[in-house]
Amino acid sequence: MGQAQSGNFSNFGDGANGDNKKDQKKDKPKYEPPVPTRTGRRKKKAQSGPDASAKLPTVIPTTRCRLRLLKMQRIHDHLLMEEEYVQNQERLKPQDERTQEERNRVDEIRGTPMSVGTLEEIIDDDHAIVSTAGPEYYVSIMSFVDKDMLEPGCSVLLHHKAMSIVGLLLDDTDPMINVMKLDKAPTESYADIGGLESQIQEIKEAVELPLTHPELYEEMGIKPPKGVILYGAPGTGKTLLAKAVANQTSATFLRVVGSELIQKYLGDGPRLVRQLFNAAEEHSPSIVFIDEIDAIGTKRYDAQSGAEREIQRTMLELLNQLDGFDTSQRDIKVIMATNRISDLDPALIRPGRIDRKILFENPDEATKRKIFTIHTSKMNLGEDVNLEELIQCKDDLSGAEIKAIVSEAGLLALRERRMRVVMDDFRQAREKVLKTKDEGGPAGGLYI
């Protein structure tokens, strides 16, 4: 019995343990996926009822919509700017009309024509003493003249009848000087010159090198030349070489013909020379090219008329300007050109004023070949063209005459509706140029 009871108790214990294990399995939680995290704003619940049918749907813009919006905003900004500009123009238009009316009224008071005088002395706020080519006048100063800018020695505008001061010339430089100054450098270069190797070398050493590398002359302990004179027969490349020098350097190029320095009134010629060199100093480094210098630089003699004496005064002023150069004005170079150097005054071309004299002669065969090659490089030549026939001719041709032959040959080809130049065109052009030269050539060996 004892064993039976013990056995029963053991069975009872085993049954209790089994029930506990079943309960633990039931209590163990099952795996559940995590709740997804919410990003952005909480979604609103869809409304229901009568208000939901009247509400507009929400449209979320895409990238294309944003670009279109930016484009429309930019167009709107431009339209606003245009509207503001139109309003400003309409507002300023009456002001411009009033300004123009005031200018017209001042011009009526000034009158035309006006003369130019020099202010000698300021007496008071309303009166001054001016001089015009000699005599002095006690004149009044108009109220619209800026009195703060008046100072002795300045140029003023005078009424042609009342001789009162009606204006002020801010720039004393003659307008002709501004015409002489070339704003753009010439297009010619050394490559456009056939031959003239020695002349190019000499003008480089005298004009170009002192402007580009002045330190070389300082190291050598010498002063660079002040100027050069180019002389020789017409059409040998004097003006062309001067233009090539201006092209190679970044200097201001002032070109004047000697006849332009001969003026009508007394003292205007020397004044123009002074203003020419003042403008050259102001725009330095600069090159002053005086072509046909024999117009004012001829030998001095007893003048028989006032015009001849005025020409001599102009030359004396030119000599004074050449002597007035100092070390601070080394950036100004003078180039002169003439066909008749024998007629020039020795004082003008002496060393110290014009340090180099460069001779230009008619080209030889090698130079002729280079000139023909330069001028025919862009032409359509026929197969029968033989330039050696023209080069070996014994005609005394200059560079300008060779260019005229080439141009005339091209014109003859165009006359016959041809775009290609043949040898007959060159022969006819050569005969025509030589005939013109023989008929219009100067007599007595003088150059015009």
From Swiss-Prot:
UniProt-listed GO biological process terms: proteasomal protein catabolic process; proteasome-mediated ubiquitin-dependent protein catabolic process
Residue numbers spanned by region Disordered: 1-58
SMART domains on file: AAA
Pfam families per the UniProt record, alphabetical: AAA (PF00004), AAA_lid_3 (PF17862), Prot_ATP_ID_OB_C (PF16450)
Principal cellular location given in the protein's record: cytoplasm
Annotated localization: Cytoplasm; Nucleus
Keyword Nucleotide-binding: yes
GO molecular function: ATP binding; ATP hydrolysis activity; proteasome-activating activity
Bias kind Basic and acidic residues: ranges: 19-31
PROSITE patterns named in the record: AAA
Segments of skewed composition (Polar residues): 1-10
GO cellular component entries: chromatin; cytosol; nucleus; proteasome regulatory particle; proteasome regulatory particle, base subcomplex
Keywords: ATP-binding, Cytoplasm, Nucleotide-binding, Nucleus, Proteasome
Residues noted as binding ATP in the record, renumbered to the chain: 232-239
Transmembrane segment boundaries: none
Family label: Belongs to the AAA ATPase family.
Function: The 26S proteasome is involved in the ATP-dependent degradation of ubiquitinated proteins. The regulatory (or ATPase) complex confers ATP dependency and substrate specificity to the 26S complex.
Name listed for the protein in its UniProt record: 26S proteasome regulatory subunit 4 homolog
